[in-house]
Amino acid sequence: MRTKKELPECPVATTVELVGSKWKLLILRNLRIRPWRFNELQRSLSGISRKVLTDSLRSMEADGIIIRTVYQEVPPRVEYSLSPLGKLMEPVILAMEQWGITYKQIKER
């Protein structure tokens, strides 16, 4: 997890730095519903490369936003879910969803 000194002073800039990429926001959108496996996430995010998905998941795990759970099974199973800190993003994602709906309705008039 990054230290306070490594993050921008502005809280909005901090949020953008941690989760502001297109893919991270869409990953969070999915993870707010349920835990997902890597291949499920990749299939649900049209256009994302394995490298970008891997980098995004590792970054959010390192920042304490998501949890990577490895199950001791054969074959191995790994799931990604929101951490308690990541769950605090749910109202933000829902607000973005509502804003997107409203924007589309206005543009359709």
Q: PLM features: what roles do these ranges have?
A:
Residues 72-95:
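Basic, amphipathic "hinge/linker" alpha-helix immediately C-terminal to the N-terminal HTH DNA-binding motif
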Residues 1-4:
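Acidic-glycine-rich active-site phosphate/pyrophosphate-binding loop
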Residues 43, 61-62:
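Alpha-helical residues within the helix-turn-helix
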Residues 6-52, 72-79:
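N-terminal helix-turn-helix DNA-binding core of bacterial DNA-binding proteins
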Residues 11, 88-109:
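Amphipathic alpha-helical dimerization/coiled-coil segments
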Residues 53, 57-60:
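Basic amphipathic alpha-helical segments that dock to polyanions
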